[in-house]
């Protein structure tokens, strides 16, 4: 427990003695921390993951994951402390119903406590203190708080830390408060940041001696003074660039812009694009050449908080050589909520590649739903589920006898997506989860390495389900490419590469017309969902009463599907793919039960008095 203290500092030892004592204490602390986290941290750092929380960079979070302890060690750096700071997690990044930890002062004494907020955002002391404060320290950079939190606490007021996206909330206290309950969240400088906290514990493979690097970077552009910008830049590979394997990539973020660069992707243009005009500018610019729309094959994707991405030692992603475009498109998403002006940037992605091709080519396969309006979400829904199938018939035909091995995944929906999950089904039984995000955000998409490689055999089924929220919409949301339309996709990265590039489904269009015919007969409203109209127009005409909603849900749960078992040429494998029955699932996976921490891992029931030294900030 930190020593009790007031704000004032006491006389100390000489500078040389203090420096020696400080360096010794830091060294001992790091040794203890590394030992406590052994097996969960790369050797070079006990806290390897870092993100800026606020746009100004005054709050920075570092962390590590201990799967043996089922806990996370957080270090929060407060560069300019005023009267305190608030940090925590909530379902979608709201201050309401949040799980919080708060450092505050009453003007005389500083306190640290586990807290929670109710539906109105009122903050309360949590009687079960699951954030364990380990150290408070002044450094040249500012004040650092080191604390520990279990993944799950079995406290109904707490957030369950799971695989996938976590919405972090933070707030800066500008003035003292007499008590925790007196803190008014509505008057705070608040913000949110999205991140994957539970990083996979995968050792970094050694790079081969012949590995080369290529930087795909923005050419010292000036970040536009607006909140959101997508910047596109075309890079051309050297003429005669032979076939290589990408084996690793990592972000290059211009120093000082860490809080502005939200995510980045590198795409390869379509093979038939033998020439693409050079371009550097906003992706929505009227000056953008149309040919850039054909640069959509993902080579690399990075999002805030992610570190380097490694391919398995036996596989690499092929690029260059015959049948491969020489043109790459970099897309950088700048998030500039403070509308900062005059900031130059050369961020991008560094590719590591080798001319010595590995045993297997890695491939990317699309799972989920076909981009079609026959799959729709009614308006004013809080959790409407759509499901796409990769059937046993397709995997039996398209996969090699030894199967494939999925090592990474990128989930994707548009604006109303809230959850995404892909489950592997074998012999009618849910076998394992490929990837799951219960707090998915369309504003935070990255290629994530899986904790465990998932092997898919011929005859297996892959089921991808997406949950949507359309509470703020008055009309049905149909499937399609538009940003106000919806998607449900899992781009899985696997090896060895096969001809199967797309394994997706949609409800049979004929059965959907039977739905429209049914509601025409059973609804008294003067509405015509007539077959001569487009499917989108038909959905627009539906009066969304409870009957029509329930019947649509039922239709999607039993009606036959149209399967798209497609090669990279967009041609389906030979076979009958229409009016296919839904795969049968006779048993499902049990929900994992969180481990409840012992009382030894908790702090005392009340606030902890802490020494933050150096005055009020």
Swiss-Prot record:
- What is the topology of this protein in the membrane according to its UniProt annotation? Single-pass type II membrane protein
Principal localisation: membrane
Q: Which residues form the DOMON domain?
A: 57-173
Q: Which cofactor does it need?
A: Cu(2+)
Report keywords, A-Z.
Catecholamine biosynthesis, Copper, Cytoplasmic vesicle, Disease variant, Disulfide bond, Glycoprotein, Membrane, Metal-binding, Monooxygenase, Oxidoreductase, Secreted, Signal-anchor, Transmembrane, Transmembrane helix, Vitamin C
Reactions that this protein is recorded to catalyse = dopamine + 2 L-ascorbate + O2 = (R)-noradrenaline + 2 monodehydro-L-ascorbate radical + H2O
Site (Cleavage): residue numbering on this chain = 39-40
Q: Which residues are glycosylated?
A: 64, 184, 344, 566
> Its pathway?
Catecholamine biosynthesis; (R)-noradrenaline biosynthesis; (R)-noradrenaline from dopamine: step 1/1
The name on file for this protein is Dopamine beta-hydroxylase
What species is given as this protein's source?
Answer: Homo sapiens
């Amino acid at each position: 427990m930190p020593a009790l203290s007031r704000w004032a500092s006491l006389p100390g030892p000489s500078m040389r003695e203090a420096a020696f004592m400080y360096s010794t204490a830091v060294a001992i602390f790091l040794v203890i921390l590394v030992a406590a986290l052994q097996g969960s941290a790369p050797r070079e750092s006990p806290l390897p993951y870092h993100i800026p929380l606020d746009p100004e960079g005054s709050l920075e979070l570092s962390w590590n994951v201990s799967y043996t302890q089922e806990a996370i060690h957080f270090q929060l750096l407060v560069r300019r402390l005023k009267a305190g700071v608030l940090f925590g997690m909530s379902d979608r990044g709201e201050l309401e119903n949040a799980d919080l930890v708060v450092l505050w002062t009453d003007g005389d004494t500083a306190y640290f406590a586990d807290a929670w907020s109710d539906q109105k955002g009122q903050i309360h002391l949590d009687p079960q203190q699951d954030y364990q404060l380990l150290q408070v320290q002044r450094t040249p950079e500012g004040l650092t708080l080191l604390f520990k939190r279990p993944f799950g606490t079995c406290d109904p007021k707490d957030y369950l830390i799971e695989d996938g996206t976590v919405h972090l909330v933070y707030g800066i206290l500008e003035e003292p408060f007499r008590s925790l309950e007196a803190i008014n969240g509505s008057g705070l400088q608040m913000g949110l940041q999205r991140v994957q906290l539970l990083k996979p514990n995968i050792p970094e493979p050694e790079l081969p001696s012949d590995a080369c690097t290529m930087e795909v970077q923005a050419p010292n552009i000036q970040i536009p003074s607006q909140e959101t910008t997508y910047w596109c830049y075309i890079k051309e590979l050297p003429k005669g660039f032979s076939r290589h394997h990408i084996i690793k990539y990592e972000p290059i973020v211009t120093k000082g812009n860490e809080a502005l660069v939200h995510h980045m992707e590198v795409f390869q243009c379509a093979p038939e694009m033998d020439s693409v005009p050079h371009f550097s500018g906003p992706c929505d610019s009227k000056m953008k050449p149309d040919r850039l729309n054909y640069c959509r094959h993902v080579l690399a994707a990075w999002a805030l908080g992610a570190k380097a991405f490694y391919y398995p030692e036996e596989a690499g992603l092929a690029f260059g050589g015959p049948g491969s475009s020489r043109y790459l498109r970099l897309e950088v998403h700048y998030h500039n909520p403070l509308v900062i002006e005059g900031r130059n940037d050369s961020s991008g992605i560094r590719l590591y590649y080798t001319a010595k091709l590995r045993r297997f080519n890695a491939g990317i396969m699309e799972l989920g739903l076909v981009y079609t309006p026959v799959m729709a979400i009614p308006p004013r829904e809080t959790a409407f589920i759509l499901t796409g199938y990769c059937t046993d018939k397709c995997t039996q035909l398209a996969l090699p006898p030894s199967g494939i091995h999925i090592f990474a995944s990128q989930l994707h929906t548009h604006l109303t997506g809230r959850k995404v999950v892909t489950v592997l089904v074998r012999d009618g039984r849910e076998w394992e989860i490929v990837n799951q995000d219960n707090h998915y955000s369309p504003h935070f998409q990255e290629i994530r390495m899986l904790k465990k490689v998932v092997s898919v055999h011929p005859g297996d089924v892959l089921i991808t389900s997406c949950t949507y929220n359309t509470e703020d919409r008055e009309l049905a949301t149909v499937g399609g490419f538009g940003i106000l339309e919806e998607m449900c996709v899992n781009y899985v990265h696997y090896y060895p590469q096969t001809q199967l590039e797309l394994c997706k489904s949609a409800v049979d269009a004929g059965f959907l017309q039977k739905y429209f015919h049914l509601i025409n007969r059973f609804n008294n409203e003067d509405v015509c969902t007539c077959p001569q109209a487009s499917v989108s127009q038909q959905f627009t005409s539906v009066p969304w009463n409870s009957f029509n909603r329930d019947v649509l849900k039922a239709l999607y749960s039993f009606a036959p599907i149209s399967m798209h078992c497609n090669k990279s040429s967009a041609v389906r494998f030979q076979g009958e793919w229409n009016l296919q029955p839904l795969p049968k699932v006779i048993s499902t996976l049990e929900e994992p039960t969180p481990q409840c921490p012992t009382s030894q891992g908790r702090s005392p029931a009340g606030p902890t008095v802490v020494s933050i030294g150096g005055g009020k900030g």
